[in-house]
Amino acid sequence: MMHSKKLTLGICLVLLIILIVGYVIMTKANGQNAQIKDTFNQTLKLYPTKNLDDFYDKEGFRDQEFKKGDKGTWIVNSGMNIQLKGGALKSREMVLYINRNTRKTKGYFIVGEITKDKKGYTHDKDKKYPVKMEHNKIIPTKPIKDEKLKKEIENFKFFVQYGNFKDFKDYKNGDISYNPNVPSYSAKYQLSNDDYNIQQLRKRYDIPTKKAPELLLKGDGDLKGSSIGSKDLEFTFVQNKRENIYFTDSVEFTPSEDTSYESN
């Protein structure tokens, strides 16, 4: 009888320990998920910034990577990528380097195409058109004979100019993950076609599918903040071996001397 009581007590103790450990792990995971979501939310607060000139006066996260006196450079990038069944992956994107020191902005409009030959080798072809930005207007810096392309460049709008994540904290059922070894983190949400941002994308791009996309937020670097890390967002409408349709966007704040445009 005494042995039976001890056995029962032992089992109860083990179960209690399992419950406590499980609770601690769950609490830690929930706290980490909330921190990841809050980290993304800090970046998403920039949406919308309708006038790109406003970035000259916007301060970003600063750390020891910034030299004394460097006001930093904002890098904004938006692009639509479409691969129809069995075809090439075609992309049209723009990147701007908004230098807060010089209060000048330069960048590129990039037309890309990725194909595979019969042997399975990948071929990447890009055509860059240099641009500058003045008074919130995109201006090609070299002559462009194709009038349609010229208008496309001049009328280009970055997602940060019209996207809006005011309800991001209310997003539910997200698949949130964290890899401490990199470190990297991500959050994925299934959206509907009624979502404001999706309606805006469909208004501006000819998206050849009615499927509602997933929103994937990706980040790397210290969760508490780092000028070395990056944060990107991606709306994935279709993703498989033969067909891909997705929109990418990023807004980063970096030391001015680290920007790829400045070093070219």
From Swiss-Prot:
Q: Does the keyword Transmembrane helix apply?
A: yes
* Annotated signal sequence range: none
Annotated localization: Cell membrane
User: One Pfam family, short name please?
Assistant: DUF576
Protein name, please? Uncharacterized protein MW2407
UniProt keyword terms in alphabetical order: Cell membrane, Membrane, Transmembrane, Transmembrane helix
Instruction: Give the record's GO CC terms.
Output: plasma membrane
Topology in the membrane?
A: Single-pass membrane protein
InterPro entries, sorted: Csa (IPR007595), Csa_sf (IPR038641)
Q: Which organism is it from?
A: Staphylococcus aureus (strain MW2)
Organism domain of life = Bacteria
| Major place of residence | membrane
Residues in a coiled coil are none
The record's section on NCBIfam families has: SA_tandem_lipo
Membrane-spanning parts:
7-27
Q: Which Gene3D superfamilies match?
A: 2.50.20.40
